[in-house]
Amino acid sequence: IDAHLNHLKNYNVPIVVCINKFNDDSLDDINYIKDYVKSRGYVCEVSDAYSKGGEGAIDLAKAVIKSCEEVDHFKPLVDKSDSIKNKINKLNKLVYNSEMTEYSEVAEEKLKLIDKLGLSHLPICVAKTQYSISDDPKLLGYPKDNVLHVRDLIINRGAGFITVLSGKIYTMPGLPKK
């Protein structure tokens, strides 16, 4: 949870943490998480919508409404005018907790192409493993000083963004209808 809270605080907006309660969750575990989040200075509510429907999410809804009434000073993590490489490096530092980024030869060539086509203003989406804050599925928890391996970039010109492929991640192929 620290990784997510540290990431979100960079945006300078109110944060509400939701614990999705399930029937087999222990009260001790829920209270531990809730107390930990509150000790970090964040609002934390439990949603029991899984078993109680909308009634189980009323406290969460109230907390979200209250946070929306606060003045926020949203700031994006990257500037639109940053180069794609600078955007990747900033995300790596602020989101993935690392200062080191390695680019494959293919990625370096794509970065040059993106600049040549005048597409550096596009936002980026990093495709990486869901198992870790890094691009290595074996680095669990909140690893520090890991290396983000950028192996390729995909220009999604129609959709208006660049996909950054990191580690050994593959995008989902189109599946047959049958």
Question: For each predicted feature, which ranges?
Answer:
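P-loop NTP-binding site
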Residues: 1-178
